[in-house]
């Protein structure tokens, strides 16, 4: 059996979608992000072939803070357990060395022993746990009581109002199940993308955005202050943008956040997620 890894090409699209359909039938999004993954200069989209057959894929993405995010690692079920996942990880470490990346991260479900076990073998350690919550967006924007929220585009102001969330949110801000390290570099990036909102009157702050597929979900990264006003504003933005749902990943240790989300009729994912880190 000959395993070869190479960069993905446009003509791999259908095969990559087939791999995802077989490997993770309950988590399918590569059809929507294939072109983005292929064109991103901040990362490398890789496929695995066994004796010339495309059987796996994986993505290495450089993050705003200079770390790397490992994602979309998929292998056809009939080819799992043959060392293909290990080949991807070895390739990720090679890319990291070539790109001067010293920290890599990935996420998985707390019940996914195989995914965690593979990361364990390569020195990854659990950094934090997160719980997912979601709420269908209203079809129409609500009342105008949240019109005092304004976008924050100044990097210094963005850093000043977001970094205090670091401890409570255990160091990460999550969008599209991508765990961004909450650092000044991320604050700058979010400010540039128009994802930060502040209501100076009530000292409320919320981040809203999507790394991809904004029509599917508007992601709440962090929020605080008048939490009811924050969530009302998020619902209004979701309706305005015609997105299907609001999504929020938060630390289970923040019991007050779960209470707030529960009170606002959010539904919770069946199991939690973990983010794992390695320094290389």
Where are these regions (language model features)?
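A conserved beta-turn-beta hairpin within the catalytic core of GNAT-like acetyltransferases
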Residues: 62-70, 80, 208-221, 268-272
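Active-site rim helix/loop that mediates acceptor-substrate recognition in acyltransferases
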Residues: 13, 20-59, 164-201
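Amide-forming acyltransferase catalytic core, primarily the GNAT-like/NAT-type
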Residues: 122-214
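Conserved beta-strand in the GNAT
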Residues: 47, 53-61, 69, 74, ...
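Conserved active-site alpha-helix within GNAT-family acetyltransferase domains
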Residues: 82, 86, 98, 110-128, ...
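Conserved catalytic-core motifs of GNAT/GCN5-like acyltransferases
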Residues: 62, 105-108, 125-139, 265-279
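Conserved GNAT acetyl-CoA-binding A-motif
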Residues: 68, 95-111, 241-251
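Conserved acetyl-CoA-binding loop-helix of GNAT-fold acetyltransferases
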Residues: 75-77, 81-95, 117, 121, ...
């Amino acid at each position: 059996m000959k395993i070869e890894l190479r960069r993905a090409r446009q003509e791999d699209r259908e095969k990559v979608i087939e791999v995802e359909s077989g490997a993770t039938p309950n988590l399918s999004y590569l059809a929507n992000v294939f072109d983005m993954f292929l064109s991103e200069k901040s990362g490398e989209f890789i496929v695995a072939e066994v004796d010339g057959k495309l059987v796996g894929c994986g993505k290495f993405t450089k993050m705003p803070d200079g770390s790397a995010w490992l994602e979309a690692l998929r292998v056809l079920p009939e080819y799992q357990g043959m060392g293909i996942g290990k080949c991807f990880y070895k390739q990720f470490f090679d890319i990291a060395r070539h790109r001067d990346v010293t920290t890599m991260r990935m996420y998985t479900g707390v019940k996914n022993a195989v995914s965690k076990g593979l990361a364990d073998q390569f020195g990854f350690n659990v950094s934090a746990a997160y719980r997912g919550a979601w709420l269908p967006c209203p079809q129409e924007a609500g009342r105008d009581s949240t019109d005092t929220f304004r976008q924050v585009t100044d990097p210094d102001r963005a850093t000043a109002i977001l970094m205090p969330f670091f401890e409570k949110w255990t160091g990460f801000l999550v969008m599209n199940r991508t765990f961004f390290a909450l650092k000044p570099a991320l604050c700058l990036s979010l400010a540039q993308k128009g994802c930060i909102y502040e209501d100076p009157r009530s000292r409320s702050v919320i981040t809203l955005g999507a790394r991809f597929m904004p029509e599917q979900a508007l992601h709440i990264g962090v929020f605080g202050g008048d939490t009811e006003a924050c969530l009302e504003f998020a619902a209004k933005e979701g309706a305005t943008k015609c997105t299907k749902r609001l999504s929020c990943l938060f630390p289970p240790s923040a019991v007050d956040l779960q209470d707030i989300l529960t009170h606002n009729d959010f539904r919770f994912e069946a199991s939690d997620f973990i983010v794992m880190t390695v320094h290389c």
